[in-house]
Amino acid sequence: MTSFTGITAVANATNEMAMFKQAMKEVAAHPEWMSSRQIERQRWNPYSMEGGSTCAISGENFAIVASDTRMTQNDINILTRDAEKIQILNDNIILTTSGFYGDVLQLKKVLQSRLHKYRFDYRSDMSVDLCAELLSRNLYYRRFFPYYTGAILAGIDEHGKGAVFSYDPIGCIERLGYSASGAAEPMIIPFLDCQIGHVTLSEGYERPELTLDRAISLMKDSFRGAAEREISTGDKIHLVIAEAGKPVVVKFLPLRED
């Protein structure tokens, strides 16, 4: 039985034809004559990851949100040291997002327009619980070509309690006491699991109450620790504090810049 270059002769003609087709697919996918630039174009990805990290913590009557301000390219080039990843939607709702920065901006724009329409129609601001459901539906609507983001929505609910809602790119929603997203999430969450959730804290150790001052201190410590080990997190901490019955407070704190 005859054979062709690169494929071992087999007794069964059907198997030989299948192997030939597979070989043709491999040649078409990686032709020797194609330049590296052309191959790269074939593998084009509409998404990119600009690094950075975000976090949110809720308490009895407060919610705090923080992010770094660094934006990177391929974890090597620093595109800007003043990237905005937190958006104050109203006095009770704060959105923070990491991921592909184009989708970060678009998602913020979509949510802002929906809140403006709600305010126009009902003459009042949307609640954080209603906004959380709205964001989930908007993300799910784009599930076949999703926003490449890790969104966290935080604020004060209708009962005056702090609320944090965490999302995946297709809109799965969960209300938590704290959440993190972005490049440093694997470092921040274990720290908060120990200090707030007490998941990994040994028995017999003191479990202090989560006050606003302690939450702010933990937020600072988590970002400073992450900046020591994660290259795309750094420059400044953008901290937003929402308390029941009080205006939103915004602070910028220094973080390592190397």
From Swiss-Prot:
Compartments, as annotated in UniProt: Cytoplasm; Nucleus
GO CC terms in record: cytosol; nucleus; proteasome core complex, beta-subunit complex
Q: Which UniProt keywords apply?
A: Cytoplasm, Nucleus, Proteasome
**Pfam families, alphabetically?**
Proteasome
The region annotated as signal peptide is: none
Q: Domain of life of the organism in this record?
A: Eukaryota
Q: What biological processes does GO assign it? A: proteasome-mediated ubiquitin-dependent protein catabolic process
Query: Tell me, how does this one assemble?
Result: The 26S proteasome consists of a 20S proteasome core and two 19S regulatory subunits. The 20S proteasome core is composed of 28 subunits that are arranged in four stacked rings, resulting in a barrel-shaped structure. The two end rings are each formed by seven alpha subunits, and the two central rings are each formed by seven beta subunits. The catalytic chamber with the active sites is on the inside of the barrel.
- Report the protein's function: Non-catalytic component of the proteasome, a multicatalytic proteinase complex which is characterized by its ability to cleave peptides with Arg, Phe, Tyr, Leu, and Glu adjacent to the leaving group at neutral or slightly basic pH. The proteasome has an ATP-dependent proteolytic activity.
UniProt family annotation: Belongs to the peptidase T1B family.
* Record's protein name: Proteasome subunit beta type-1
Species of origin: Caenorhabditis elegans
As recorded in Swiss-Prot or TrEMBL, the protein's gene is named: pbs-6
